[in-house]
Regions:
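A structural boundary/capping signal
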Residues: 1-304
Length: 304
């Protein structure tokens, strides 16, 4: 049993436990109550209890404390950092709006307006799509919010795409996950890198992925960047008005993982690799601003 009821009740029937002996329970499939967890707006402390009964009498009981995070809260790199991939939400309705704006920006720049992922087999085309997404986010007029101290280690609540588009405020991790979702929905493979006190987005320029979901060395990223297989993007630049060009966002993000900063690099999470390990996006829809509230996008992309 659990209090609050974040677990669905589960019972096992054991025919016999001999004196001074033990029995291993093989069926340990305890089901979480997703509906309850989805209602948590803030983290709460709870407990899970295992009770042993015989003939209706309790003969043993053990209770363990559990911390329940809010539905939109990531626990940090200290525990299962790969779960950050769940906050890349490509199917959030807000992402389609961003990709629509990115398509218009491509068209205005005289480029093909299809958001076609790796279909063209061109690294230059991936750069163009990523640059157009950057421009579309710049046009939102987002304001910067200071993240919690040591968020990359201890975690934080993450604003979902619809919340960002509605309220126009975000931390570096919020905008990074927004970019990740847009890149993923565009058919590209995103990466999230976590230097100390910061978060930046990345995208593979060809259909690649890291060998594991999470890496803790920046050298792997640097090698792929040098091979022109991967770029990183400083997503907080979208909160500057006017925003720096896309090439500057790429250069600045790359500087955040220089060898001199290796001792402060926390992790990088490969979103596509996480999906192949069944870490899927959060199942939560958000409202996007209605069309009458939207302002026309102004192409500010840097598209060679």
């Amino acid at each position: 049993s659990a209090n609050p009821p974040f677990l669905k009740p589960k019972s096992w029937r054991l025919d016999r436990i001999g004196p001074d002996s033990s029995v291993s329970v093989k069926d340990r499939d305890v089901e979480l109550d997703g509906g309850f967890l989805l209602t948590l707006a803030d983290s709460v402390r709870g407990n899970a209890t295992v009770t042993v009964e015989h003939d209706g009498h309790v003969v043993a009981e053990e209770t363990k404390p559990v911390e329940l995070l809010a539905y939109n809260e990531w626990g940090g790199t200290g525990f299962m950092p790969e779960l950050l991939a769940a906050f890349s939400m490509p199917n959030d309705p807000a992402i389609d709006r961003l990709l629509h704006d990115a398509s218009l920006i491509l068209r205005a720049a005289g480029k093909p307006d299809g958001i076609d992922g790796y279909h063209s087999k061109s690294r230059q085309r991936v750069w163009e799509i990523a640059s157009a997404i950057y421009a579309a986010v710049c046009n939102l007029g987002i304001s910067y919010a200071v993240p919690p101290t040591s968020f990359e280690r201890d975690g934080q609540k993450i604003r979902l795409p619809g919340q960002i588009l509605e309220n126009r405020v975000s931390t570096c991790l919020d905008t990074t996950m927004l970019f990740s979702a847009a890149l993923e929905q565009a058919g590209l493979n995103p990466v999230v890198a976590l230097p100390r006190g910061h978060a930046v987005a990345g995208v593979w320029l060809q259909p690649e992925e890291l060998s594991t979901i999470v890496i803790d060395d920046a050298e792997t990223l640097r090698k792929r960047i040098q091979l022109e297989e991967l770029i990183l993007i400083e997503t907080t630049f979208v909160t500057s008005h006017p925003a720096p060009p896309f090439s500057k966002a790429v250069a600045t993000a790359t500087e955040s993982i220089t060898p001199e900063r290796d001792d402060t690099f926390h992790a990088a999470v490969d979103i596509r690799r996480a999906r192949s390990h069944r870490i899927f996006p959060l199942c939560r829809k958000s409202e996007t601003p209605s069309a009458k509230d939207e302002t026309p996008s102004i192409p500010v992309a840097e598209l060679p």
